[in-house]
């Protein structure tokens, strides 16, 4: 966009909305898309705008079978809005755009821009080109043009941040289309990662989550199998960084040096999300998961030996082609043995373009649903039992923003414990801010949250809370600009159980 057009955009405050679907990597990319648009002179549309913006960007997911229907349904709802709003533009990016390309404009000719996973930095240019030429711009790159972390960013929080350490994936899981859309794994330089973290901490961020499709394969580019554990230890030496998390590792690459680094680095949190996908060796082989049940449970045993307080969660697919009742019972057995704090269970969804889509033995939906309900019931009880063990414990909870839907009605606040469990607690007499740390005693446990009903034992104001206060005060005084931070607090939330395995799954 030319300087004249940029000035015009600022003068009339052209607005934008970014809608994000799918995994944490997409959320990370959407922060960059927002930063790019604000750098081009757009301002963020108010919450609840529901498409009432000058530019609406869809950052799509291609994992679920109904991802296409969801996108085109939403695009269809915007079509009449566009006819009533002169100059409105619609852009579609992400994995579904990378996959479908020309199909999107054929099915929704009112779309102005289609871009892929490798060229998100081109969005402002493509929007301007579409405006000037008055025709749709479709540009899909086949390889990464710029590491997303180098792009302008508009983060949503002043106290917690995603930090991407790699993009792409070298695995060939038969159910997953993501490697074909995100490309081969490409690692970021360790020095660049640490420099970004240090800059974030200087801005007030106190928690970071290292992000990649397969984080513990980090270093494969240079042949250093211990690069990820070294990175964790390096994070432990950054003054002011209180909490470090990561997502998601692959069991194949989960080595003892990583477990040691987790246990020996105080600011690496006692939490592990490691996708199992199935407990059946037969199904794991069909999935090309390159580990078996014994190996997976062995990793969990080692993690718990090193960190007895660790909360371990996972992803599981039910109804993969060829899964027998015996195979499913092996998954149930593995869940009983592992005793996950949480498990995100998904009904298998056929994705065109994946080997699993053409496999024999596709399971009837009613069978998949019945197994899914059995597994969900088992995990619900285990989650509750594991949470009950927290009652009576004293925990340091980092105050969150927007985590408790009922906080206003219950006069409580919410936050995350070190192991990432959600805690609702009584408001202390002293005012606290997101990013501050409150020490509480747990009095009650539910399957998906903990409750601390007594007066908090201590409140610690933090630089992160200061940063949030400064950010909030500044936002009230002037339009939002390019910020540092992250949506939400704690590790990025996994997809809801109704969804599908995320791109970040190992």
Swiss-Prot record:
SMART domains: Elp3. Its main location: cytoplasm. Keywords: 4Fe-4S, Cytoplasm, Iron, Iron-sulfur, Metal-binding, S-adenosyl-L-methionine, Transferase, tRNA processing. InterPro entries: Elp3/MiaA/NifB-like_rSAM, Methylthiotransferase, Methylthiotransferase_CS, Methylthiotransferase_N, Methylthiotransferase_N_sf, MiaB_methiolase, rSAM, rSAM_horseshoe. Signal peptide: none annotated. Residues 155-386 form the Radical SAM core domain. [4Fe-4S] cluster 2 binds at residues 169, 173, 176. It catalyses: N(6)-dimethylallyladenosine(37) in tRNA + (sulfur carrier)-SH + AH2 + 2 S-adenosyl-L-methionine = 2-methylsulfanyl-N(6)-dimethylallyladenosine(37) in tRNA + (sulfur carrier)-H + 5'-deoxyadenosine + L-methionine + A + S-adenosyl-L-homocysteine + 2 H(+). Its cofactor is [4Fe-4S] cluster. Its EC number is 2.8.4.3. One of its GO terms (molecular function) is 4 iron, 4 sulfur cluster binding. The keyword 4Fe-4S applies. It is found in: Cytoplasm. Binds 2 [4Fe-4S] clusters. One cluster is coordinated with 3 cysteines and an exchangeable S-adenosyl-L-methionine. Catalyzes the methylthiolation of N6-(dimethylallyl)adenosine (i(6)A), leading to the formation of 2-methylthio-N6-(dimethylallyl)adenosine (ms(2)i(6)A) at position 37 in tRNAs that read codons beginning with uridine. Belongs to the methylthiotransferase family. MiaB subfamily. This is tRNA-2-methylthio-N(6)-dimethylallyladenosine synthase. It comes from Streptomyces griseus subsp. griseus (strain JCM 4626 / CBS 651.72 / NBRC 13350 / KCC S-0626 / ISP 5235).
């Amino acid at each position: 966009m030319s300087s004249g057009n940029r000035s015009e955009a600022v003068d009339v405050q052209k607005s934008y909305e970014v809608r994000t679907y799918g995994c944490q990597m997409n959320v990370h990319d959407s922060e960059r898309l927002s930063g790019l648009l604000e750098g081009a002179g757009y301002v963020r549309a108010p919450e609840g705008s529901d498409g009432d913006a000058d530019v609406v960007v869809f950052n799509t997911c291609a994992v679920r079978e109904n991802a296409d229907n969801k996108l085109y349904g939403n695009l269809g709802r915007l079509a009449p809005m566009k006819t009533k709003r002169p100059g409105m533009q619609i852009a579609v990016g992400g994995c579904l755009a990378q996959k479908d390309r020309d199909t999107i404009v054929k099915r929704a000719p009112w779309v102005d821009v289609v871009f892929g996973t490798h060229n998100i930095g081109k969005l402002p240019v493509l929007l301007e080109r579409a405006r000037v030429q008055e025709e749709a711009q479709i540009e899909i790159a086949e390889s990464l043009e710029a590491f997303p972390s180098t792009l302008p960013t508009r983060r949503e929080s002043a106290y917690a941040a995603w930090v991407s350490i790699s993009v792409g994936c070298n695995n060939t899981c038969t159910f997953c289309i993501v490697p074909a859309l995100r490309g081969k794994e490409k690692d970021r330089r360790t020095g660049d990662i640490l420099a970004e973290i240090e800059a974030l901490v200087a801005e007030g961020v106190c928690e970071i989550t290292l992000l990649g499709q397969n984080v513990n394969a980090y270093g494969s580019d240079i042949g250093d199998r211990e690069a990820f554990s070294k990175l964790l230890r390096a994070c432990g030496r950054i003054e002011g960084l209180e909490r470090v998390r990561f997502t998601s590792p692959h069991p194949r690459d989960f080595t003892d040096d990583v477990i040691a680094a987790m246990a020996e680095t105080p600011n690496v949190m006692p939490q592990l999300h490691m996708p199992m996908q199935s407990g059946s060796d037969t199904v794991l082989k069909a999935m090309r998961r390159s580990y078996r049940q014994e190996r997976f449970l062995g990793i969990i045993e080692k993690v718990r030996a090193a960190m007895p307080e660790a909360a371990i969660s996972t992803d599981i697919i039910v109804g993969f082609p060829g899964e027998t009742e015996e195979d499913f019972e092996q998954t149930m057995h593995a869940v009983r043995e592992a005793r996950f704090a949480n498990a995100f269970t998904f009904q298998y969804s056929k994705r065109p373009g994946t080997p699993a889509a053409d496999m024999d033995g596709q399971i009837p939906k009613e069978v998949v649903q019945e197994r899914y309900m059995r597994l969900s019931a088992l995990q619900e009880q285990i989650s509750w039992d594991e949470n009950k063990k927290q009652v009576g414990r004293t925990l340091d909870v980092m105050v969150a923003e927007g985590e408790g839907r009922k906080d206003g009605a219950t006069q409580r606040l919410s936050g995350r414990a070190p192991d990432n469990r959600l805690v609702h607690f009584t408001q202390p007499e002293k005012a606290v801010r997101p990013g501050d740390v409150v020490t509480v005693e747990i009095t009650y446990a539910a399957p998906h949250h903990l409750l601390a009903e007594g007066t908090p034992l201590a409140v610690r104001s933090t630089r992160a809370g200061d940063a949030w206060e400064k950010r909030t005060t500044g936002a009230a005084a002037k339009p939002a600009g390019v910020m540092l931070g992250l949506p939400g607090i704690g590790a990025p939330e996994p997809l809801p159980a109704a969804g599908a395995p995320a791109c970040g799954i190992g």
